Swiss-Prot record:
This is Mycothiol acetyltransferase. It comes from Renibacterium salmoninarum (strain ATCC 33209 / DSM 20767 / JCM 11484 / NBRC 15589 / NCIMB 2235). Catalyzes the transfer of acetyl from acetyl-CoA to desacetylmycothiol (Cys-GlcN-Ins) to form mycothiol. Pfam families: Acetyltransf_1, Acetyltransf_7. Residues 29-173, 181-338 form the N-acetyltransferase domain.
Length: 338
């Protein structure tokens, strides 16, 4: 983090009389500014029912040497009035991949439909450009689609959010583990290295998950929601990890109930094709149900038909979706979805 006060926001004079001053940071924010960003995110969660930033982005916002570009839009105010955040855009640049980044953007509900998103994207275009940039729309808002169209981004990936209602009449089959496999919980300061190896192998073709580092893992373990007991490991007779189901419980935001999540399910390549994925999924759901939760959610790529079919067979139904947009120069046309 920077050691002194952040640079005062500069007004974007290209806009009309309703100007939204913009501040650009090329590093993780100072503590006070991080708290303001997180407060804005919480307000958005209360309104939208889902977070505007991924866990990875939240980790990087707290990391001193994170490869970040942050743009903050402020509410126009008199000089003596403390500036309030109207919106935030965060670009996480990917290590080892020049000019390759992932954008997430959120506008305070009070200031939506007033041009804040446009100002943030115009400022981002000036500060960085859109080359090799992917952008997530969490919840696939219509306003995000309009911004994507306006700035020339194209939809390239759909991530479905599914939900399972655990009412009294819904019975799930018991988890049936393969022979010589047993379940235990993750043990902090013991299982990190072994889990990272299995996670990397299980998600070798899924960089968002497979590139999780020890620092990333430790940051997640420091989150308030982390529960080692709900981090289930499938181990063989030598205690080697063959798979895992990391569960998560989202605290109840205003107007919403607490909800469990099938956070990550991963299977070591040597154990794939043996039914372990389904067994771990069921074991995690059972754990969450015993915590008193009545709803379970998960994310799954829309084109992962095998996983979608499995979850639907267990009673999961579509809730909403996230959409990834990409600037054309960074888009492989073969990956576009219709």
């Amino acid at each position: 983090m920077t050691t002194g006060p952040a640079t005062p926001p500069q007004t974007n004079h290209a806009e009309d009389r309703t100007e939204w001053p913009i501040q650009v940071l090329r590093a993780a924010p100072e503590t006070y500014l991080l708290q303001e960003i997180l407060k804005l995110a919480e307000v958005a969660i209360d309104t939208d029912g889902h977070p505007p930033f991924s866990d990875q982005t939240l980790i990087q916002l707290r990391s001193a040497n994170a490869p970040l570009l942050i743009l903050l839009s402020y509410v126009p105010a008199a000089p003596e009035v403390p500036a309030a955040l109207a919106g935030v855009a965060v670009v996480l640049e990917h290590d080892g991949q020049p000019a390759s980044g992932t954008l997430e953007l959120v506008v305070h509900p009070t200031y939506r439909n007033q041009g804040v998103g446009q100002v943030l994207l115009k400022s981002l275009q000036s500060a960085r450009g859109f080359e090799s940039l992917n952008a997530w729309s969490h919840g696939s808002h219509a306003a995000a689609q309009q911004l994507a169209d306006q700035f020339g981004f194209e939809a390239v990936r759909a991530l479905r959010r599914l939900r399972l209602a655990l009412d009294a009449g819904h019975q799930l089959p018991a988890a049936s583990l393969p022979t010589n496999i047993s379940l235990r919980s993750f043990v902090p300061d013991q299982d990190e290295a072994a889990w990272l190896a299995v996670n990397a192998a299980a998600f070798a073709h899924h960089p968002e998950q497979g590139e999780t580092s020890l620092a990333d893992l430790k940051s997640l373990m420091e989150e308030q929601w982390f529960d080692a007991a709900g981090f289930l490991l499938a181990v063989d007779e030598t205690d080697q990890i063959m798979g895992f189901h990391w569960t998560k419980i989202h605290a109840a935001p205003a107007g919403h109930q607490a909800i469990g999540e099938v956070y990550v399910v991963g299977i070591a390549p040597a154990a794939q094709g043996k039914g372990l994925g389904k067994a771990l999924t069921l074991a995690g759901i059972d754990y969450l149900q015993k915590k008193g939760l009545s709803s379970i959610m998960l994310y799954v790529d829309a084109d992962n038909t095998a996983a979608v079919s499995l979850y639907q067979s267990l009673g999961f139904a579509r809730w909403d979706a996230d959409t990834m947009y990409s600037y054309p120069s960074a888009t492989n046309s073969n990956n576009k979805f219709q």
